[in-house]
Regions:
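Aromatic- and acidic-residue-enriched carbohydrate-binding clefts of CAZyme catalytic domains
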Residues: 1-17
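Short, solvent-exposed loop/turn segments at the edges of secondary structure
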Residues: 2-4, 69-71, 106, 162, ...
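Residues that line or immediately flank small-molecule/substrate-binding pockets and catalytic motifs
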Residues: 11, 78, 150
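Short acidic, glycine/proline-rich loop/turn micro-motifs
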Residues: 17-20, 159
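Noncatalytic carbohydrate-binding groove/subsite architecture in carbohydrate-active enzymes
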Residues: 19-133, 139-142, 194-205
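Aromatic/acidic polysaccharide-binding cleft in carbohydrate-active enzymes
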Residues: 109-218
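Asparagine-centered strand-capping/turn motif at beta-strand->loop junctions
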Residues: 221-223
Length: 223
């Protein structure tokens, strides 16, 4: 009755004890049980694997093969604090896509980024976030969405270890931090279709993508 379209099974599973094959196998077992229960009620719901992505782990192929056709997406949580975050994440996304297609050339599994993480909320984090957004745009429909953490942070009362709130608040005030405004700009000027573009003479210092509306009535540059 709530119109839920996507459900992630868990969050950052098989992370805290390292790369353990038995924990990946246990995750697959639990995923399958929940898959059958959810799909039995609503076959249209898209399910998301949240097993921690480790591209070099032998458990990745085994987990992928066990969930291929059941998980629509694999949740990937990159670090987004650095100026090079966009380039690094784009390389990892391309590797993920390459591995998926190597393991099954006909797979429909794709990626979703439900958390871009970091420990800052300043202009450097803005640049990490927006270059990561450009990386996602260049990946086309392989990546469903990318979400910057965290949404809220109580001013001088934060006790969860993360210092990356987009919106700070007190009992009487609410204000956005720089990443909030970058996200606001991206949402306000979203266009669904990517346009090919290139940069010359910038010595690699500019990261640029372009998108347009379906009717081709407007083009947005992300620089």
């Amino acid at each position: 009755p709530y119109g839920v379209k996507y459900i992630g099974i868990g969050n950052e599973e098989v992370l805290f004890n390292g790369d353990r094959a038995d924990e990946y196998d246990h995750y697959v077992e639990r995923f399958n049980l929940l898959h059958d229960a959810i799909k039995g009620k609503d076959p249209s719901v898209k399910l998301i694997s949240t097993a921690w992505w480790r591209a070099d782990s032998p458990s990745m192929e085994r987990t992928f093969r066990a969930l291929d056709g059941k998980a629509d997406y694999w949740d990937y949580h990159p670090w987004a604090d650095q100026l090079a975050s966009g380039r690094e994440v784009e390389a990892e996304l391309r590797r993920m896509r390459e591995l998926f297609l190597r393991w099954n050339p006909s797979t429909t599994m794709k990626c979703v980024i439900f958390e871009e993480n970091g420990n800052r909320h300043d202009m450097q984090r803005v640049l990490g976030h927006v270059t990561l957004q450009n990386a996602v745009r260049r990946m086309g429909d392989f990546v469903l969405t990318s979400c910057a953490a965290n949404a809220l942070q109580p001013y001088r009362q934060n006790d969860n270890g993360w210092d990356q709130g987009q919106v700070f608040f007190t009992p009487s005030q609410v204000w956005g931090m720089p990443p909030y405004y970058a996200q606001q700009m991206a949402a306000a000027h979203h266009r669904p279709l990517t346009v090919g573009c290139g940069v010359e003479g910038a010595d690699g210092v500019l990261d640029v993508t372009a998108t347009r509306s379906r009717e081709a009535g407007s083009v947005v540059l992300h620089i």
